[in-house]
Amino acid sequence: MSYRKQRETKETAIDIRMDLNDNQASSINTGVGFLDHMLTLFSFHSGINLQINVQGDTEVDDHHTTEDIGIVLGQLLLEAIKDKQSFTRYGAFYIPMDETLARVVTDISGRPYLSFNAEFSKEKVGTFDTELVEEFFRGLVINARLTTHIDLIRGGNTHHEIEAIFKAFARSLKIALSDDGSKGVPSSKGVIE
């Protein structure tokens, strides 16, 4: 099933199409090269096809673009989760990226919460401010109503640190979204909102 959302503010114009069942190559153009790279990795490792086109005020900096993409992706994920008939709910994954190690644990709980425990080795990767990684995930997690714990266990090269986090999140989400074969909501309450 395909989901699409367009969002326009005075800072960004975002158009994202997301498909959980389409293994075609994604097309990602955010205007922020490093973010394009991370979202391409996220798409590949989660199995979620993304078509992203963004016009943002990157002449100011990359903050609005990065945060707003996280918000829209979270909103699209929430729509997809509500439509799923069966899913595992929980996912956890470790990713080693050479010298770095990241762990991400995700619960499709309906209770939005992000624990972000990562201190990056440097403040920038190229022109990308590393503090924006947390802003991206906060926007995504809160809007998708996930409970997610992100931990950078071992650091090293800053690019590797961030890449390990994006890949671990993608894999944990893929597990949480996977069909567990049961019918109904994976909660003893009978509902996840």
Swiss-Prot record:
GO terms for biological process: L-histidine biosynthetic process. Its EC number is 4.2.1.19. Transmembrane segments: none annotated. GO terms for cellular component: cytoplasm. Keywords: Amino-acid biosynthesis, Cytoplasm, Histidine biosynthesis, Lyase. One of its GO terms (molecular function) is imidazoleglycerol-phosphate dehydratase activity. InterPro entries: IGPD_sf (IPR038494), ImidazoleglycerolP_deHydtase (IPR000807), ImidazoleglycerP_deHydtase_CS (IPR020565), Ribosomal_Su5_D2-typ_SF (IPR020568). It catalyses: D-erythro-1-(imidazol-4-yl)glycerol 3-phosphate = 3-(imidazol-4-yl)-2-oxopropyl phosphate + H2O. It is found in: Cytoplasm. The keyword Cell membrane does not apply. Pfam families: IGPD (PF00475). It is an enzyme of class 4 (lyase). This is Imidazoleglycerol-phosphate dehydratase. It comes from Staphylococcus carnosus (strain TM300). The gene is hisB.
